[in-house]
């Protein structure tokens, strides 16, 4: 865990939890740390959809602490912050970790009604995880140990990881010059 998160203002800077796209959930305590920083609604949206957020949204939600111009400015910003601490242990501001039942119900309605649990078990498992362990950041991080392995060995996760590797292979093979001289499209109507 970090005492302070610095990010660049580049449009390429993205923060998120893409694990759901592989049929798993965040691990290594990430769900608990993020939940403590941004609360139920925001963490569920990020973890269940797998959509990343840009640097400005990360600052607004509290996922990141400080925005710098570009990667070259990171060292100087961190140095200034460390000098400003003067040996004191920094205080990381945490939100109250109280699970809001209405947000859990809203998340189930919003995210799960279009999904088949046997094809994509991770979103439901993530919502259950927040509901069961969200009362305590430490319990939430420890709860990952119960949930993550079951998702990892599921057939849905295995298939989603296979799709990821195949898609990545197609992207890599599509790079470079093409020797195609003529192309016909049949049945494009």
Show the residue positions of the predicted features.
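Basic, glycine-/proline-tolerant helical and adjacent loop/strand elements
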Residues: 18
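Amphipathic alpha-helical segments at domain termini/boundaries
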Residues: 1-3, 7, 41-139, 143-147, ...
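Glycine-rich adenosine-cofactor-binding loop
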Residues: 174-189
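Hydrophobic, secondary-structure "cap" segments at the distal end of domains
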Residues: 30-41
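Mobile "lid/hinge" segments at catalytic clefts and subdomain interfaces of large enzymes
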Residues: 21-24
């Amino acid at each position: 865990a970090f005492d302070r998160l610095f990010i660049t203002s580049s449009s390429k800077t993205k923060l998120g939890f893409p694990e759901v796209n592989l049929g798993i959930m965040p691990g290594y305590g990430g769900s608990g740390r993020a939940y403590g920083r941004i609360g139920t609604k925001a963490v569920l949206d990020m973890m269940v959809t797998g959509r990343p957020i840009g640097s400005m949204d990360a600052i607004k939600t509290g996922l990141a602490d400080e925005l710098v111009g570009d990667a070259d400015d990171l060292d100087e910003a961190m140095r200034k912050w460390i000098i400003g601490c003067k040996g004191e242990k920094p205080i990381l501001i945490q939100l109250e970790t109280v699970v809001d039942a209405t947000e859990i119900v809203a998340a189930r309605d919003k995210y799960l009604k279009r999904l088949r649990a046997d094809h994509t078990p991770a979103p439901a498992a993530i919502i259950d995880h927040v509901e069961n362990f969200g009362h305590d950041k430490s319990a939430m991080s420890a709860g990952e140990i119960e949930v993550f392995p079951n998702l990892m060995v599921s057939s849905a996760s295995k298939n989603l990881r296979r799709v990821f590797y195949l898609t990545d292979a197609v992207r890599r093979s599509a790079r470079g010059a093409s020797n195609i001289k003529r192309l016909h499209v049949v049945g494009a109507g």
